[in-house]
């Protein structure tokens, strides 16, 4: 055959359930997560294990980044290339029996993620299978910065399945790209000071202060006077090696070695040294363990930035994944960023995630996938 087909969605929803027994007992959470069951919980019946937990929404019907991607790719209104000189593009109606006449076209002009102009117009008649050139008379885009044009085709009135204003098709055009950001000047600011009292070193600079214990690691860290670490950081503050990650939901099943939760690290030592002109302080952590040894080298720069170089050496046969674990001050609960969002996206799943400025709680960055991506 000369034809091929791909990108099909096997399942709309993760096929996991809450059992009757758990509902009756009120046993709906495990370690803070929803307790769902899959085929593995019913060995007496034919099943496919966890395989059918591959939907684009979660078992409790919450959207995921996969849903945003599918919606953008499947949408039945196609946007042609933007003619930046004429400020026009072509709309093609892929619906079988719907005319686009009366649909609302809403647009926003963004510069570096911020809305600088917006407008709305009503679409003319565009019959099924037909195309129409559409013009948007947005303003000046000659300033420095990255200009983007967001376009959405929206319902003018509520329907039985969506409210008025619901977007049935979207796109984002890049009108211009911003120039490269200036490289950070790590030597900005006054030289750092390094002092020692007992087993604790103190690093001080204009924008940073840090305490490092030679047996515990980093126990205090402030940026601009704000604590980066939790208050009880005396016990575990430094980033540490973590391999607590396995295919089926990090489940600690019995004594199976693949589900051990420890990292196998038996010793950690820390050394601290300033360079000759106090423009940087280096913190070196060496650790040994049954699964791997590692060496972390932190470079604290006078401008307040911290670079971390991590090197791992495998020592055992059951090393599954290499990662790092660090806890932050819980008061640092909000983020603002200029990138793709607002749902999770990856380099090969980003068409449904537009560039913009997003203000989100840290909790929004956690997605309860039934099965971790592997």
Regions found by a protein language model. Give the residues of each.
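Conserved, mostly hydrophobic/aromatic
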Residues: 7, 70, 91, 151, ...
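Short acidic/polar inter-strand loop motif in beta-rich domains
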Residues: 153-162
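Asparagine-centered strand-capping/turn motif at beta-strand->loop junctions
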Residues: 91-97, 314
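Beta-strand/loop-rich accessory regions of lumenal/periplasmic or secreted enzymes
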Residues: 137-144, 159, 174-374
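Short, conserved beta-strand segments of beta-strand-rich sandwich/propeller modules, principally
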Residues: 104, 146-150, 307
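Extended substrate-binding grooves/exosites of carbohydrate-active enzymes
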Residues: 1-86, 95-101, 106-115
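Intrinsically disordered, low-complexity Pro/Gly/Ser/Thr-rich segments with frequent PxxP/GP/PP motifs
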Residues: 110-144
């Amino acid at each position: 055959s000369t034809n091929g087909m791909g990108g099909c969605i096997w399942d709309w929803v993760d096929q996991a359930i809450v059992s009757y027994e758990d509902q009756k007992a009120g046993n709906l959470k495990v370690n803070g997560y929803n307790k769902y069951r899959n085929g593995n919980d019913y060995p007496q019946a034919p099943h496919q294990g966890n395989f059918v937990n591959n939907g684009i929404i979660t078992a409790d019907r919450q959207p995921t980044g996969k849903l945003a991607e599918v919606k953008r790719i499947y949408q039945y209104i196609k946007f042609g290339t933007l003619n930046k000189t004429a400020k026009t593009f072509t709309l093609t109606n892929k619906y079988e029996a719907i005319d686009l006449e009366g649909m609302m076209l809403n647009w926003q002009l963004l510069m570096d993620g911020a809305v600088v102009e917006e407008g709305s117009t009503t679409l003319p008649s565009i019959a099924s299978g037909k195309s129409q050139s559409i013009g948007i008379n947005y303003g000046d885009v000659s300033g420095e910065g990255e200009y983007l044009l967001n376009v959405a085709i929206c319902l003018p009135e509520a329907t039985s399945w969506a409210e008025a204003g619901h977007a049935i098709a979207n796109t984002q055009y890049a009108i211009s790209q911003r120039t490269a950001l200036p490289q950070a000047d790590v030597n900005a600011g006054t030289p750092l000071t390094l002092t020692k009292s007992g087993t604790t070193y103190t690093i001080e600079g204009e924008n940073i202060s840090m305490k490092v214990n030679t047996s515990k690691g980093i126990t205090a860290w402030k940026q601009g006077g704000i604590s980066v670490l939790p208050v009880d950081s005396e016990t575990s503050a430094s980033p540490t090696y973590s391999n607590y990650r396995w295919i089926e939901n990090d489940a600690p099943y019995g004594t199976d070695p693949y589900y051990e939760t420890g990292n196998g690290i038996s010793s950690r030592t820390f050394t601290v040294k300033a360079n000759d002109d106090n423009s940087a302080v280096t913190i070196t952590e060496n650790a040994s363990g049954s699964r791997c040894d590692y060496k972390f080298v932190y470079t604290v720069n006078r401008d307040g930035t911290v670079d971390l170089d991590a090197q791992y050496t495998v020592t055992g046969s059951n090393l599954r994944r290499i990662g790092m674990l660090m806890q932050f001050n819980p008061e640092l609960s909000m983020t603002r960023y200029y990138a793709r969002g607002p749902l999770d996206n990856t380099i090969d799943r980003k068409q449904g995630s537009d560039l913009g400025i997003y203000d989100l709680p840290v909790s929004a960055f956690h997605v309860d996938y039934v099965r971790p991506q592997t």
